[in-house]
Design a protein with these regions (language model features):
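Long, low-complexity intrinsically disordered regions enriched in Ser/Thr/Asp/Glu with frequent Gly/Pro
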Residues: 1-4
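Phosphate/nucleotide-binding beta-alpha loop and adjacent structural elements of enzyme active sites
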Residues: 6, 10-296
Length: 296
């Protein structure tokens, strides 16, 4: 119908505007942040920092719009060398440190590098799922972990903390109270099934981060698998996700930190209403009028 076509056309225009506005806002907010000496450069801490073949680093858009640096932790040497060779254009410091709770563990190096972990596979779970049953450990070594509080004690503010450490996020976060107190956004892989023996699940990580002053915002990615009996296209089991947390604004005393959160909300996640909400709080505290950018 004519009305249906009109409504569909409006919907398309709105969606197009939503796609375009984050790019413009990212540029303007990035310039604003670069102009505040106390906030620039922004700091990304990447725990589990190897590059993945099929995707960019989640924080790449952030580094494209403002000055930033990356402090990464990646235990596999060939993965560190690979990333250093491919990303010479950014301020990147990669360290071999294994982040954890400060104790000794057996590091399980698996046939798929990205699944290597301080914990062994839980074969009862892994063998049941079509996408996971070929995973296996090919080597082990004894290692000593370091807490985040120890590893980055000299970093005054963490703007974006990303963790992808295969079942070990909870111990890493539980021993990072000082770092979390000065972190603005956490992007963390969480599991809903125990792929690794002894691992904590999302239901454990969520209250830990809330207790440290963070609000759960969204899952930026959800991964589902089919059971091995098939059919493979029937991905019926939710296995893991990437969870996004923002430090509650009422716990932040420095207004510029809220401006950084707004920049991350729009630049990495495309969350315009969240960004505008945060900008409104920043304007209220700082006497600025950045919220007007959303009306352009």
């Amino acid at each position: 119908s004519v009305l249906g076509g009109f409504l569909l056309s409006n919907e398309r225009r709105e969606k197009q505007a939503l796609r375009e506005q984050p790019r413009e806002l990212s540029q303007k907010l990035g310039q604003a942040i670069d102009g505040i000496a106390s906030t620039s450069p922004l700091t990304v801490v990447d725990v589990g920092a190897q590059s993945l073949e099929d995707e960019d680093h989640v924080y790449a858009p952030m580094l494209a719009h403002t000055k930033g640096r990356v402090i990464g932790f990646e235990p596999l040497e060939h993965r560190r060398r690979e990333r250093e060779a491919n990303e010479r254009n950014i301020d990147l410091s990669l360290r071999p440190t294994l982040i954890g709770d400060g104790r000794s563990y057996t590091f399980h190096i698996n046939n798929i590098d990205a699944t290597s972990s301080l914990l062994p596979f839980n074969r009862d779970i892994v063998d049941d799922l079509n996408d996971h049953r070929t995973l296996e450990t090919v080597a082990t070594e004894t290692v000593v972990t370091t807490t985040l509080d120890e590893a980055i004690s000299d970093v005054s503010r963490v703007d974006f903390l990303k963790l992808d450490i295969q079942g070990f996020a909870y111990p890493a976060l539980a021993n990072a109270a000082s770092v979390l107190s000065r972190t603005l956004v956490v992007h963390c892989e969480v599991e809903f099934l125990p792929f690794y023996l002894g691992q904590a699940l999302f239901s454990d990580v969520d209250p830990l981060l809330r207790a440290n002053g963070f609000r759960f915002v969204d899952f930026s990615r959800l991964s589902r698998s089919a059971f091995r009996s098939g059919p493979p296209a029937s991905r019926d089991q939710l296995g893991w996700a990437e969870a996004v947390y923002f430090k509650e604004a009422d716990t932040i005393t420095n207004p510029s930190w809220i401006l950084i959160q707004a920049f991350i909300a729009v630049t990495i996640y495309g969350k315009l209403s969240l960004a505008r909400h945060l900008i409104g709080e920043y304007d209220r505290r700082s006497g600025t009028s950045y919220e007007s950018l959303f009306d352009d």
